[in-house]
A protein has these predicted regions:
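Active-site lining segments of carbohydrate-active enzymes
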Residues: 214
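A charged, solvent-exposed segment within the mature domains of Sec-exported extracytoplasmic proteins
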Residues: 171-211
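C-terminal segment of N-terminal export signals and the immediately downstream linker at the start
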Residues: 43-58
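Extracytoplasmic/secreted envelope proteins and their assembly/folding machinery
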Residues: 80-87, 100-103, 146-153, 177-180, ...
Length: 215
């Protein structure tokens, strides 16, 4: 089993490129492909009950999540909740499924679908590893799930960076991975396309069960 350190980044002068010895995402979080089931199981601990069907609380939105690893067949409760919340927020905005798919693949690649707390690439954090220094809001904003999702979509008031709906106004006509790359400007753009199937599987599992979140 790979050690946890093998998934962590080495900083670059640009703050975006990953260590040459480990194929990581733009902000150094996601190893190529998916993390093995054994690795994921060893890292996951008991998770709280699902928030689905309940109020999405402020505690949920700001929960510090430092777990690592993603396997579509072994998502833990936090990953399920976060995926459901992304779907709920996109539904609440009345957005098409293509937008939700791009949002999900970006969160899978950037943070393993966790509200990742530690700053990995200089000042990055949260579901999308957004950087305050790049106009995505404050350090607290990028670690607040609703604010981070809205900022990624380009619908929040806390971000000056162009979000998905500004950068790719005709999302449905784009290849999902390319749409994600247009927002994220990754040093490893191929990573997004690799997670399209996972995002669509998540949509198939949960979309019909999740109510729109409009708060």
């Amino acid at each position: 089993m790979s050690s946890l350190s093998s998934f962590l980044p080495a900083s670059s002068s640009a703050g975006r490129s990953a260590a040459a010895s480990a194929p990581l995402s733009r902000r150094g979080l996601f190893a190529a492909g998916t993390v093995g089931l054994a690795s994921l199981t060893s890292l996951a601990v008991a998770a709280p009950a699902s928030a689905q069907g309940e109020t999405w609380t402020e505690a949920f939105m700001t929960r510090e999540e430092t777990r690592e690893g993603f396997e579509i067949g072994a998502m833990d409760q936090w990953q399920v909740e976060n995926a459901q919340f992304i779907i709920a927020v996109c539904k609440g905005h009345g957005l098409e499924e293509a937008v939700t798919t791009v949002t999900l693949i970006t969160a899978i690649v950037e943070s393993w679908l966790y509200n990742y707390e530690p700053a990995v690439d200089l000042d990055s954090g949260g579901l999308f590893q957004q950087r305050p220094s790049m106009g995505w809001g404050s350090a607290a904003d990028v670690r607040h799930k609703k604010k981070a999702i809205d900022a990624f979509l380009g619908l929040g008031e806390i971000s000056s960076a162009p979000g998905l709906l500004q950068a790719v106004p005709d999302v449905a006509s784009w290849e999902p991975g390319q749409a994600a790359q247009t927002v994220q400007a990754s040093a490893h753009p191929e990573r997004y396309a690799e997670q399209v199937t996972s995002a669509r599987t998540i949509m198939d599992r949960y979309s019909r069960k999740v109510a729109p979140f409009t708060a």
